[in-house]
Amino acid sequence: MWKFAIHSQQPFCWQQLCNRRHLYVGNVQQQTHLELLDAAPTRSDDEWLQAKPYEKVPGPGTWQVLSYFLPGGKQYNTNLIQMNRRMREWYGDIYRFPGLMGKQDVIFTYNPNDFELTYRNEGVWPIRIGLESFTYYRKVHRPEVFGSIGGLVSEQGKDWAHIRNKVNPVQMRVQNVRQNLPQIDQISREFVDKLDTLRDPVTHILNDNFHEQLKMWAFESISFVALNTRMGLLSDRPDPNAARLAEHMTDFFNYSFKYDVQPSIWPYYKTPGFKKFLQTYDKITEITTAYIDEAIKRFEIEKDSGNECVLQQLLSLNKKVAVVMAMYMLMAGIDTTSSAFVTILYHLARNPHKQRQLHRERRRILPDSDEPLTPENTKNMPYLRACIKECMRITSITPGNFRIATKDLVLSGYRVPRGEGVLMGVLELSNSEKYFGQSGQFMPERWLKADTDPDVKACPAARSRNPFVYLAFGFGPRTCIGKRIAELEMETLLTRLLRRYQVSWLAEMPLQYESNIILSPHGIYVQVRAAC
């Protein structure tokens, strides 16, 4: 879940800073050599020699691309889903998006065999470009704070593996994440209690403030995991530092879109706006570090109080690791989780029959709505988890997965040299009849392994047998590290909300999305009424 997409009005390759043998990290003068690219031998086998040359990959020319995205162009004001769909219609299942402003090309592919080849050949150090501004901030602007500790989004090669290997056991272990359930449940209860203030008293339609408050729910939840602190963001009197941090996180998303996604001259000239961005990073670092320092004092007093929380385990590795990971969790775990939850709510609101089936499962788990959620009573929630997977199949907030090829590859019959960017259009395939029967239907039953109710029959035949067609959280060593936390948060809030309410979609048109760092929903015409 914690992945960043790109704005469709700006070509994807504007984000890529690779040439075929070197990767420039952070758009800075310092060049990070990825030895694995040079170490991979040049191919001379029959498959490679018989494949079509890279230059023959279909696709638009540079000026044609520019015309697409200018006002009046065919792709102007389209979101990422629309852009992918149109380009595929025009150029087929593989095409080359030309590099602009000195950047490299990117290969877009919609062939699951290409997905598998790319993933299977990425090695132990997969390369995926992340937030370049954060790399610059850590390595150039504030090296005295972060030292050699890198972030999961922005590091590559050995540096990435070093931090990932440290934090994997902390954030991917089920019991580590599930120990946060009591507090995550309490936060979800507080949000559901607040719903009456977020809907019209007569029509019961959610108001414009709903999504912003949902972000505060996501912020409150992830900050407890990252900082072991309740911020009070759902109350009328949040902690002053928490309120400041929330404002700075909003600024971060706005600045990141402008300087990490859109074309910018900041790598060559530090504009006043980019300097404000660095100040925002400073404030986030300052407040995050202060919360961690408070937690350290608290942990000293509460020694031997039971299982160590996520923050304690990160601190046992290194305080700098804890600061970097806390910042990463905050940056990656707010808009992504809240936007995904809106999408889930939308699909359930449009499918009342499935919602009723889910409500029956909720009542079995919580006969008494005031009963707390526990690891025991949340083990058996197959239909809820199937609903979440089906929502993410139909509308993922990150409709593609990106990698730099670390070996020479043959994709769909074309040579793709190592060092080239490859964008795998997963969302297009997961909405295709070729891979999912009745792909246009909301059918959670396709994800069930067995019948869960006399009226709920498993239908695995409607699910693709190819595991590379549905990859909501990525694949391999760079699988989304926030997967388990995001799932816990969404499962908990969905359980609480649908135990008390039923939701309906009132608009004629489907939910709309706009592209930012991720695909963000807007125009949420959901009615929330008391459940029968």
Swiss-Prot record:
Name of the protein: Cytochrome P450 12b1, mitochondrial
Domain of life the protein comes from: Eukaryota
Keywords: Heme, Iron, Metal-binding, Mitochondrion, Monooxygenase, Oxidoreductase, Transit peptide
The gene coding this protein: Cyp12b1
Gene3D superfamilies registered for this protein in UniProt: Cytochrome P450
Originating organism: Drosophila acanthoptera
Molecular function (Gene Ontology), one example: iron ion binding
Family statement drawn from the similarity comment of this UniProt entry: Belongs to the cytochrome P450 family.
Keyword Flavoprotein in annotation: no
PANTHER family (alphabetical): CYTOCHROME P450 (PTHR24279:SF120)
Keyword flag Transit peptide: yes
UniProt function note: Probably involved in steroid hormones biosynthesis.
Cofactor field: heme
